[in-house]
Amino acid sequence: MDTPSPDPLPSPLPGEEEKPLALSPPVPRGRRGRRPGGATSSNRTLKASLPRKRGRPPKSGQEPPLVQVQGVTAPVGSSGGSDLLLIDDQGVPYTVSEGSAAGPEGSGPRKAPHFCPVCLRAFPYLSDLERHSISHSELKPHQCKVCGKTFKRSSHLRRHCNIHAGLRPFRCPLCPRRFREAGELAHHHRVHSGERPYQCPICRLRFTEANTLRRHAKRKHPEAMGVPLCAPDPGSEPPWDEEGIPATAGAEEEEETEGKGEPA
């Protein structure tokens, strides 16, 4: 059986010329198939229309929101006073002065510090204040499983566990000695550098450690235990001379020498 042949293409009419098909140029696309100026611009517009976080002063022309704090309702940034009642990210209200809340022009409000009620130390974030409050607490929740000793912080427990494990991770680069803590290594460096930052104000001897200076003062100068051991004080007793040595030092030795006298 013969297969029918396809119909031939119609020939152009006389007087007409064949023209190529006109294709539109491809539309450029951004990354991930986004058209430039399309979804990105709409996202930016959407973000700009979203409300800002709590704690920022309202724009001019808008009524400030009301905040309920201990039964007292006060508008944030009200013109009745120079203080601003704000709320941080944790939902805790705090009051700052209008001058301190506004930072440099165009930088927005500056976060007010949180003060420790015990030592009045200031912290920029509430989490830092909560971490600091552990030092004033008597609780020691971290306990060593070997000896049962308790600690306030987990870092102190990890450092203590190095004693039972025999680990000394801090090694001196100048000698083979190793230490459990970085502070011990820093003190050991004074042996190689010759640094003696602690000086006796009476005999002017210098020491590497503060404990060594205290032992020296108890043994050599028991009568001057009330004298400051770090630096001479011109207003303290006994009086200090220009070199920082007590003016009465050595007076008893001179009296003993004069009392004996030379043999006749």
UniProtKB/Swiss-Prot annotation:
Chain segments carrying region Disordered: 1-75, 225-264
PANTHER family recorded: ZINC FINGER PROTEIN, ZINC FINGER PROTEIN 771
Protein name as it appears in the record: Zinc finger protein 524
GO terms for MF: DNA-binding transcription factor activity; RNA polymerase II cis-regulatory region sequence-specific DNA binding; sequence-specific double-stranded DNA binding; zinc ion binding
Entries under InterPro entries matching the protein: Znf_C2H2_sf, Znf_C2H2_type
GO cellular component terms attached to this protein's record: nucleus
Job of this protein: May be involved in transcriptional regulation.
